[in-house]
Amino acid sequence: MGKPTGFIEFQRLAEANEPAESRLKHYREFIITLDDEQASQQGARCMDCGIPFCNSGCPVNNIIPDWNDLVYRGNWEQALAVLHSTNNFPDFTGRICPAPCEAACTLNINTDPVGIKSIEHAIIDKGWEKGWVLPQPPKVKTGKTVAVVGSGPAGLAAAQQLARVGHSVVVFEKSDRVGGLLRYGIPDFKLEKSHLDRRIAQMEVEGVEFRVNQEIGGESEHSIAAERLLAEFDALILAGGAEMPRDLPVPGRDLEGVHFAMEFLPQQNKVNAGDQVPAQIKATGKRVVVIGGGDTGSDCVGTSNRHGALSVTQFELMPQPPETENKSLTWPYWPLKMRTSSSHEEGCVRDFAVSTKKLIGKNGKVKALRLVRVEWQNGSMSEVAGSEVEIPADLVLLAMGFVAPVKQGLLEELALELDARGNVKATTDGDGCYATSVAKVFAAGDMRRGQSLVVWAIREGRQCAREVDAFLMGSSDLPR
């Protein structure tokens, strides 16, 4: 700890954003990274905690106090090494992680927490700028082969870890580009795809092979039988995510103009990449309604505003959370409180405790929603009598989360055992971690745990890689 009084001398300084009126004209990132002096001061705010709760609050267990102190002292290259020791892709988490570490920061008990995420962002950006982020190809090859199905954060983390210890790794991706959720689920204004592309290039030098347009299981023209992978590879990691969206089973669901968020968002990313997207779903000049109050819903809001929507309204079934948390009750855990994203700041009407009763159409196209107020008591929901109302809508986007992995194809072909929620069953404790019910098949990320954060997917990919390495070699030196 380099500055014992840093948390007293320096106030928390958040990263700045480009003004909304200008950033709405493009799809680039708009966050302004801290400069060296600002990052040093923010690192100085890190206290000499007896127990660094930030470390346990972070799913990948980043050694946060160490790299905060190193940034304060100006030792950026060593800070990057410490950061990379626990996280393969701080370029992603430094941009899109909600930072549960900051909720767990000891300062957060009675003041503003350390700006951990902004410091992480500054470290990795400086690392690339200075040329410190280099491939780490293995010195010796093991002769073992691993297939990774899915190129999202869990699959990429597992593939990189295994390649670095000498295994031959092939990543299979059903889409036309590598990246999974990072590529097509997260808007470019939150994560420009150049960050993803340079990581993929790094991994290719390390020996990872990527095969796109290849779906494992199923009957499409690009599909490959799951049994073929079992025959050709020594181990198989399933990291295909939880792609089955939660639907809205109400009258009018089949009207034109009603779409899942993951039909809407990927199209814009494809357009940004230079692709031609026939019949793109556009919000231009439309009254947009987003159903679902989470991050994906927020991404729909930001994208709709960039399209030039006439209006954007977001509905959430749950009641409005409090503006601030009771820290004496919630710390060091992630608190339930009102969160306003940059997309909300760009223009959006938000309403809570609202349920959709019916989608109303005209000539086969959605024109309105019939809504009702709901009350919550002891975890149960009831409608408020006489509260029904209709609001106009030309485009309805369903962003209510994801319920499970897709069963058809890969999971059915392998006849994998599922847990009670419909995810691939695989424990993270004891012997046989991440192993499924089928020999030499492992699962990690959202496909195993259900919908979650990118940082959790990275954690699971890293841990799964260690278990696969131990399975192949008898033991593993990879970190847990």
Regions found by a protein language model. Name each.
Residues 23-41, 63-95, 99, 110-140, ...:
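Ferredoxin-type iron-sulfur electron-transfer modules in oxidoreductases and energy-metabolism complexes
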Residues 80-87, 100, 119, 182-234, ...:
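N-terminal Rossmann-like dinucleotide/flavin-binding domain of flavoprotein oxidoreductases
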Residues 123-140, 198-213, 245-307, 419-435:
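Glycine-rich dinucleotide-binding loop and its adjacent helix/turn
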Residues 167-183, 312-322:
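Glycine-rich FAD pyrophosphate-binding loop
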Residues 254-285, 377-451:
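FAD-site-proximal beta/loop scaffold in flavoenzymes
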Residues 297-302, 307, 438, 447-478:
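A conserved FAD-binding loop/helix module that cradles the flavin
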